[in-house]
């Protein structure tokens, strides 16, 4: 996974030394690694692949700037994910809902996780960024290079598809 990269240990956790060379980089890495790993994991569906993506995100971001912002890190993540998945235009199109599908009540976490993984890549990333990480639509739009209305539409389409997938799994 990290072939040829020397490891440095800080408080028991492993950090690639190619990524973390100073205290400020360590602070940036520590502040953002969990958020970025979660997004990478949900987009790849694989722990090892998510770790590789995470490493590449930080290497790329630290090559661009000594102190990359959260948005720069997000853009680096999207660039890495684009190499793995077809991110781009919204892929779902739903007609107006004539009725609300019956998914009220408790939904098992494993059912929701499976449904999220079945969403198309762009809608999944918008859903994870907005509902999972609390990003605003303007930030999502800037990060993905889409318009704010497209971000809103992608979130709505993703939620409708989740509702459909959850209703069908019952």
Give each language-model segment a name:
Residues 2-38, 67:
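A short, charge-rich alpha-helical start-of-domain segment used by transcription regulators
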Residues 13-16, 110-119, 142:
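Short amphipathic alpha-helical boundary/capping segments
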Residues 30, 41, 130-132:
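Short amphipathic helical patch at the helix-1/turn junction of helix-turn-helix
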Residues 33, 38-41, 51-94, 98:
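Σ70-family region 2.3-2.4 aromatic/basic alpha-helix that recognizes the −10 promoter
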Residues 33, 122-123:
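The N-cap/first-turn positions of alpha helices
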Residues 91-117:
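Acidic, proline/glycine-rich intrinsically disordered inter-domain spacer in sigma factors
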Residues 126-127:
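A short pre-motif secondary-structure segment
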Residues 144-170:
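DNA-recognition helix of helix-turn-helix
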């Amino acid at each position: 996974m990290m072939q040829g990269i020397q490891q440095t240990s800080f408080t028991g956790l492993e950090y690639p030394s190619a990524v973390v060379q100073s205290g400020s980089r360590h602070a940036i890495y520590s502040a953002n690694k969990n958020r970025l790993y979660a997004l990478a994991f949900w987009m790849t569906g694989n722990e090892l692949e998510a770790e590789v993506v995470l490493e590449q995100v930080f290497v790329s971001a630290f090559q661009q700037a000594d102190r990359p912002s959260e948005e720069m890190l997000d853009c680096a993540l999207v660039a890495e994910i684009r190499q793995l998945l077809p991110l781009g235009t919204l892929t779902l199109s739903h007609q107006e809902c004539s009725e609300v599908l019956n998914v009220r009540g408790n939904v098992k976490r494993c059912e929701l996780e499976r449904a999220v993984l079945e969403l198309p890549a762009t809608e999944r990333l918008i859903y994870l960024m907005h509902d999972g990480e609390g990003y605003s639509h303007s930030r999502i739009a800037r990060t993905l290079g889409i318009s704010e209305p497209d971000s809103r539409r992608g979130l709505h389409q993703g939620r409708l598809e989740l509702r459909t997938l959850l209703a069908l799994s019952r």
